[in-house]
Structures are given as structure tokens and as C-alpha cells.
């Protein structure tokens, strides 16, 4: 299975439910602030990092900086997609290695 492709796409799309726009909707799809204050504060701190990171990137073909605020939803989803694909790949490697180890006993 190609974890790089499938994991990134699935992880990316699922993560949109928790990006700067998707997090505002509850389980029924209603616009509702369903996160407690502590969770929201932690989220804001983490998104500041992503906004800063991508806001400091200049697109060389046009020599213009990205707007980290405007692109945060996609940037959050991209990062989450990569992270979940990597985790799934790691689990597959561990599982495969355990099968090899057990078959050699």
C-alpha cells in the first residue's frame, strides 16, 4: 500500500474538520463553538506557529511571500496529513517486522 499517497490525502481531508474553518462546526454541521476555552487557547498557540512558518516562505517564481493567515487551513491539513501518513507507515513497518521476527522463531 502506498502510505505516502493515500495517507496524506485521507489525513489532509479529515484534518479540514479541525482547521480554522472546520473546527467551528459541531457534529451535526451547525455553526457552534464546541471547544472549551483551554482547547481553543492551545489550538490558537499551535496555529500561530504554522502561520509564522508559512508566512516566512517566499514563492520564488513570483518573489512574493505567502500569507500564512490566508493559507492556514490548507497548511494545517497538509501537516496533519503528512503526520498521519508517517504514523501509519511506522505502524505497518512495526507490524511487518514482527511477522518476520515471529516467522524466524
Predicted regions and their residues:
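Zinc-dependent metallohydrolase catalytic domains
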Residues: 1-5, 16-105
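P-loop NTPase nucleotide-binding module
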Residues: 9
Amino acid at each position: 500500500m502506498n502510505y505516502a499517497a493515500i495517507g496524506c490525502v485521507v489525513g489532509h481531508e479529515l484534518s479540514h474538520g479541525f482547521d480554522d474553518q472546520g473546527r467551528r462546526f459541531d457534529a451535526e454541521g451547525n455553526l457552534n463553538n464546541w471547544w472549551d476555552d483551554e482547547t481553543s487557547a492551545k489550538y490558537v498557540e499551535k496555529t500561530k506557529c504554522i502561520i509564522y512558518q508559512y508566512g516566512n516562505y517566499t514563492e520564488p517564481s513570483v518573489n512574493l511571500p505567502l500569507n500564512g493567515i490566508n493559507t492556514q487551513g490548507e497548511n494545517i491539513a497538509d501537516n496533519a496529513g503528512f503526520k498521519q501518513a508517517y504514523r501509519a507507515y511506522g505502524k505497518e513497518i512495526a507490524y511487518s517486522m514482527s511477522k518476520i521476527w515471529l516467522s524466524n522463531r
